[in-house]
C-alpha cells in the first residue's frame, strides 16, 4: 500500500495511472490452441489480490477514479517446450510435475496464456 500511495501522490491531479494485474483463471500451457496443462497461479494471485484490495481502497476513498477496465489474454511465446520449462525454473509459479515430460518433448512453438486486467485510473 505504501508504494501505491507514493505513486498516486507523484501523479498530478487528473493524471492517469495504469494498473495491470494477472487474474483468474489459472494460466495454461498450450500447443496449437490445445491446453497441455494448467499452471498453478495461486502464488502470483496472492500478491495480485493484495494489490487489487489496495487499489480498490483508493477508489473507495475517492483518491482514484476507475475509468476503464479491460480483461484480456496475454500469451508468452516459446520456441519449444524445453524453453517453456526452463523459463519456469526460477518462478514462484511452478509447472505441474506430471506435465514436465510432455512439455519437454514438444519440439514446436508453444505458448503460456494467462488472463490479465488493465485498469485506467484517474488521480483525484
For each predicted feature, which ranges?
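Active-site capping/gating segments
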Residues: 41-69
Amino acid at each position: 500500500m505504501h508504494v501505491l500511495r507514493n505513486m498516486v501522490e507523484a501523479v498530478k491531479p487528473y493524471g492517469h495511472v495504469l494498473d495491470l494485474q494477472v487474474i483468474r483463471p489459472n494460466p495454461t500451457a498450450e500447443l496449437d490452441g490445445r491446453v497441455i496443462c494448467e499452471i498453478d497461479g495461486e502464488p502470483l494471485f496472492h500478491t495480485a489480490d493484495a494489490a487489487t484490495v489496495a487499489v480498490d481502497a483508493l477508489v473507495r476513498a475517492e483518491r482514484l477514479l476507475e475509468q476503464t477496465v479491460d480483461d484480456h489474454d496475454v500469451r508468452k511465446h516459446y520456441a519449444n517446450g524445453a524453453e517453456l520449462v526452463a523459463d519456469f525454473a526460477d518462478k514462484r509459479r511452478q509447472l505441474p510435475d506430471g506435465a514436465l515430460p510432455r512439455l519437454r518433448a514438444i519440439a514446436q512453438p508453444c505458448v503460456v496464456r494467462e488472463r490479465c486486467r488493465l485498469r485506467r485510473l484517474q488521480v483525484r
